[in-house]
Amino acid sequence: MQKETPNALRKHDNFEIIFFELDNDSCPVQDFLDSLNDKMAAKVYGMMDVLAEFGNELREPYTKELEDEIYELRAKTGTDICRVLFFFRSGKKIIIPMDL
């Protein structure tokens, strides 16, 4: 099964998800997502679609504010859990950084 490649950008009618990119156009977030097994990658991309649709209205158990407007998106398959950090910006943008 081939993993979906969003080219560092996922856009819905409601919110736009933007992956952090380095100056050399590499995308550590995409590299991380590409390293996941197919099942977990599908779950994370599915949760990103839900996040893009509901934005700041999405709550636990799917998202959680950690501190100072930094959130985590949670994806779980079986006993495996993946957490992706993100924050909101004006203009209905969700930024997924390389690291915080």
Residues of each region from the PLM?
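Basic, Lys/Arg-enriched alpha-helical interface segments
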Residues: 1-81, 90-94
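Conserved beta3 VAIK motif of the Hanks protein kinase fold
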Residues: 97
